[in-house]
Regions:
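Conserved AAA+ ATPase "sensor/coupling" helix adjacent to the nucleotide-binding pocket
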Residues: 66-68
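Short glycine-/acidic-enriched loop or helix-start segments at secondary-structure transitions
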Residues: 45-47, 62, 123-124
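Conserved nucleotide-binding/hydrolysis micro-motifs of P-loop NTPases
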Residues: 55-60, 119
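Short loop/helix-cap segments at secondary-structure boundaries that form the rim of catalytic
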Residues: 41-48, 104-107
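ATP-dependent small-molecule kinase phosphotransfer cores
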Residues: 1-45, 58-59, 70-72, 82, ...
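Small-molecule kinase domains that catalyze NTP-dependent phosphoryl transfer to phosphate-bearing small molecules
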Residues: 72-126
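C-terminal accessory "lid"/substrate-recognition subdomains
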Residues: 93-94, 112, 125-146
């Protein structure tokens, strides 16, 4: 099942979102330092340092193609781009309907970073740097573009 297929399935099976949401809500009650990969963690764990990692859609499609994922066997960049667009639309629709929130609103996140031209190490270092500033109550830019 591709990520897009899972998103389409979840549009008609809200019990999956409910289970995930309850797990996220429970994290808000803990004192643990954890990293969560979630489109909605900012909503359910509002005390968190929420980061949105954006990527140019062509870069994202190329990365997926280069990874040669069994679950996403695209035959062309165009096919990958179309699947990414459909997935994003499905997620946006689902979260708007379920929670009344716009996940594309960058104001929902403490920090936004464009990963299109950064290595994974550069992205991790920037996130850690900005997390430390946030933890210390120091100002930092909301968005780090190209």
């Amino acid at each position: 099942m591709t990520t897009y297929e899972l998103n389409k399935y979840m549009e008609t099976h809200p019990e999956i979102d409910d289970e995930i949401d309850n797990g996220l809500r429970n994290l808000e009650k803990t004192d643990n330092n954890v990293i969560i990969d979630s489109r909605m963690a900012w909503h359910f764990v509002p005390s968190s340092f929420s980061v949105y990692m954006t990527t140019d859609i062509l870069v994202s499609a190329k990365r997926i193609m280069d990874a040669k994922r069994d679950s996403e066997p695209f035959s062309s960049i165009e096919e990958a781009v179309n699947s990414l667009k459909a997935r994003r639309a499905s997620e946006s629709k689902r979260y708007l309907e379920l929670y009344g929130v716009d996940i594309k609103d960058m104001n929902n996140y403490k920090f936004v970073i464009d990963t299109s031209i950064r290595t994974p190490d550069e992205v991790a270092n920037e996130i850690l740097h900005h997390y430390r500033l946030w933890k210390e109550g120091k100002p930092f830019p909301h968005t780090l573009d190209k």
